[in-house]
Amino acid sequence: MGALPASSHALITAPLRGEDEIRDNAAFEAILWALSRPGDVRNLPKPGPRTILLALIDRECRVHADDPVIAGLAAQTGATLAPLHEACHVFLQLDPGADTARLATLKTGSALYPDEGATVVTEARLGEGQRLRLSGPGIETTREIAVTGLPQGFFALRNDLCRYPLGFDLFIADGSKVMGLPRSTRIEVL
């Protein structure tokens, strides 16, 4: 088969990116950077877990969401809605009085497949409240952060469940801000 005539090259153009694709790519970049630099706060193009969902979820994902609106949006992507203990992507509504016992059923992977640990997304206030000291990959020495709006004992339970390489990755959304805490991050409650 011969080469295309030189004049036909001008007919081939790249598709234009739509507003949704631009938003989802910007959100993906923000959450990627947030997870690679634990404790850093990144800006999302639009507020809330909805933006994170649209950047991460597709039809190959198993999703659990406490909020029916988020669950409906996940279903629209073609993702499979799953119970908490089977979901790879978990969108939780955790208010300060919530019972954390159910979090013990989150997928944390196995020695053979640690990558099967869940990705958890929740909302809380960043920059105020309970002080935490972070250490581990992506942090030069240590880093102190503050988070409020999560149940008492949440980070203690998270530490029990996250024994690297096992565990779950956590995104905390606060309006249009997001912070990532990967399973490899050690969290000391101050």
Segment roles from a protein language model:
Residues 1-62, 66-69, 75, 176, ...:
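N-terminal, charge-rich interaction modules
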Residues 60-61, 67-190:
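Internal, well-folded beta-alpha domain core
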